[in-house]
Amino acid sequence: MMTKEELHKQLKELGLKKRMKILVHVSLSKIGYVDNGPDSLISVMKEIISDDGIIVMPAYNSYGEYKPNLSIVNEIFKNQCDTIRTNHVIASFAVWGNEKEKIGVNIEYTEEGLSFEAGERSPLAKLYDNNGWSLMIGTDYSTCTILHLAENRANWP
């Protein structure tokens, strides 16, 4: 079992620090049992980053009851009172931190139509443009949504 203190130490050793802006992808089941589970992980990230930083997690498109195939960490994070959620129909994000509105932009309807979830006006673009980082815990790059921004900027088909 990993304690909250051990988790704090490991995330600091990994390079997490105050004021960072991070996009988090996590599979808690892949790292083993954590004392107090998702709540510990979320609170440790908030302690380290501080509210001067920003934490972003995919909120998926579940607007109703919890769906077990989605991350419980993301589910708990997006429902916390100090977290905002973007309003994209299929690719929303949950955002926390003092400047969450800077990253947590909502979709826009323009003459071109609905803004792309990884387009230039997306939370991913805002995070990247503000020196954001990607934190992968128990996952690999196949789950890293920031890559969609890279594909978009590279005009990948």
Language-model-derived ranges and their functions:
Residues M1-P157:
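N-terminal and secondary-structure boundary signal
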